Amino acid sequence: MSTNSNQNSIHTPIPEFPENRSTNRSELAAAFEPPDDDVEYSETAPLYSSARASIEGEEAFYQHLSTPDPGNDSGHVRSSNDRIPSTSSNHADGHHVDSVFSNLSAKPTVESNTEELEEEPPSYEQAAADTAPPYWDTTMVIPDYGSNEIYIDGMSVGTGFSFVWSACVAILFPFVGFLVTYVLSTTHLGRYGAQIGLSLTLFQRGYIMISESGMENNDDQYNYDELPHQKLIGSILIIIGWCLVLVDTFGFIRIRRMKNAISRTDSPGETSPEEVV
């Protein structure tokens, strides 16, 4: 009750001309009033401030109509037909916004630029005169290891000594020697020698497992549970070893034939396609 009394004390009395319009205006003002008295009207209650400005303009206009014209001797009071609509005049003068619903009809104004420049592509002479920007090129510099070296697939062929050396190291140091020689070798024959050493190591391990499977244990009893599995694993190792030997042998022969074919191309004689393959 105290809030409503404070809010009603803010408004000035509205003349009863016309009655229905004053009643509607008072209800509209009550609808847009802020909930508290200490709220700033201009910032936190824009709807209330715009409605209040519109109501005050209406009240001033009604008071102007009800007062007699001093230039009129008959004391005639102006009627409502003599007034000018305040909404259009206020909008034309730009004093205040009539209501919140007037923003619905507002449209953004787009400034038309009549001096827009039409961009056109350059002519052929201008495009031809324009120099191309520089581009970075990647140049690979391969050191010269000698005129006798032949490279196949980016790696030199190698010699027979590297082949035998890699195979011996892979056999003397099983698995570890293969990894060292295969990773550190920079020639085709060196890597094939490491693979040959690995295949011979697998063949040797498989043969030992098969031979030990038929021997008696220390307690003079056969371990029948492990015999079939040990023979199977040994057989698989022997098969893998033989396959690696065949693959490495064919690879070694192919590299040697390619080396011979490339070396013959330096001579005046022609080589047949069969020799290259």
From Swiss-Prot:
It holds the Pfam family NEDD4_Bsd2. InterPro entries: NEDD4/Bsd2 (IPR019325). It is found in: Endoplasmic reticulum; Vacuole; Membrane. Residues 113-122 have a biased composition (Acidic residues). Residues 1-130 are annotated as: Disordered. Belongs to the BSD2 family. PANTHER family: NEDD4 FAMILY INTERACTING PROTEIN, NEDD4 FAMILY INTERACTING PROTEIN 1/2. This is Probable metal homeostasis protein bsd1. It comes from Schizosaccharomyces pombe (strain 972 / ATCC 24843). The lineage of its organism: Eukaryota, Fungi, Dikarya, Ascomycota, Taphrinomycotina.
